[in-house]
Amino acid sequence: FTTTALTSEIWLIYEEENQWKSKKIADIGDASKIPLPVDISISADDQLLWVNTWNDGETRLYDVSNPHAPKQIFNKKIGDQVNMVSQSWDGKRFYYTSSLLGNWDKKTGSKGDLQYFKAFTWDGADLTQTFGIDFIEAKLGLPHQMRFGAKALYANLYSKQNDKRVALSR
């Protein structure tokens, strides 16, 4: 999957009969309002696709169990702007940051909703905020991206051998 910023579309890139193809499979919000999709995250089981749109501050969830016909099943406003999303492998914890580019970032808005890091839990029906940092209030600069460290992602893929960690080939 990929998104197009100014036309606000989701495209599927797939292989068929030994040829790569692409096709538009969904619109994201009202394209005339330029929601500006900036980040996507696919669940570990490849069934769900999260799409963040910076201009309206929303995250949208699509059921992509049939990748040729996704269905939007959820949306939530995360802040006045939203940029990156990172999710845990079990799909229960989500981390959002807000800064796209310093010169483009909004300068006015709700307290705590312009420059932030926010953590949420997903229960299968709603995102519930569990933690947040207002980067303006804390004078921390512009939060662009947050990712899990390699140990958190790949802890099960390591084997101790002579007291050294070795990545296993699969």
Describe the role of every protein-language-model region.
Residues 129-170:
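Sequence/structural signature of beta-propeller modules
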Residues 49, 92-96:
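Entry beta-strands of beta-propeller and related beta-repeat scaffolds
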Residues 1-60:
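Beta-propeller domains
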Residues 7, 56-58, 70, 111-116:
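A detector of repeated loop/turn-to-beta-strand junctions in beta-rich toroidal repeat architectures
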Residues 97-117:
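Short, conserved, GDST-rich strand-edge loop motifs in beta-rich repeat architectures
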Residues 29-47, 79-89, 140-153:
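Beta-rich, blade/repeat-based domains predominating
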Residues 12-21, 61-69, 119-131:
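Short loop/turn segments immediately following beta-strands, especially the blade-tip
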Residues 21-29, 71-77, 119, 128-141:
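Beta-propeller fold detector
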